[in-house]
Amino acid sequence: MLHARAFKVSVVWTLLLLYLGSVVHATESSLACPDWPTCFGTMLPEMTGGVFWEHLHRLVAGGLVLMFMLATWLAYKETKARPWIFRASLFGMTLLIVQSVFGGLTVIYELPDLISTTHLSLALLFLALATLLASSTIVIADSYPARSGFRVRAWAMVLAGFVFVQSVLGGLVRHMDAGMACPDVPLCLGQILPPLVNAPITIHFFHRLLAILLAAAVLWFAHRVYWKETWLPIRRWAKIVAILVVLQVTLGFVSVLTLLAVIPVSLHTLLAACLLASLIHMATIFPRSSAATPGVLAPPTN
């Protein structure tokens, strides 16, 4: 079905957009185009320096809007038996437009912390919804054996929620310029518990603390799924999330050690988004009951 493919493309496109957004900030290109939606009064500025990254980010964002509009229209045409998919797509379209407006506001008001972090938060919420739609419209051929009783769906969604919170906290670290508030690794200012004397140190420290706790929880979850479940697709995704969370924490430390170099910082954002999407995918494809099969998540043949 074409709508299923369009949702998958939208997920990948959103991940690319999040990566580009991080590159824009890491290269200090966020205000390279001082106006919005144009750039120096034109839609075709000279693509050099920071303008290249900022305007490329805007062009990719515009492309995502068009791509998801197509996905929504295809969902309307092809999912008559599952109307919730079209309704969710409409909500996603609204969310995407609001997120784009917040992108403009970050430029107009010159990067206020709250608006910039809201811009990132809405992008992550859209990614979560797009992943839900993409995962709900796939066909999984593997038969599903008896389940272990471990609440995979519930745990995956809870952890996805915490990954979202941690990502928003990371956005605050970025937009408050708190990335080097703790300049050493793994300690902070040479201490396990640093003096929380200002907002940048406090935000950075709690971002690290939650990262360690969340990484431990995700690794525990992945271990339980891999060894308790026998369904191959869910075991494969358990390995993926375990790898992602280890790489994510590593990149967080590398970002500090390299003084917030563009590539590790941008990959740090990308992997957080990939981890969020992977957990939502696991929760969505996992059958609701032992009698269910993966086919319940497949699109109807209409």
Describe the predicted segments one by one.
Residues 1-302:
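Polytopic transmembrane helical bundles with strong interfacial aromatic enrichment
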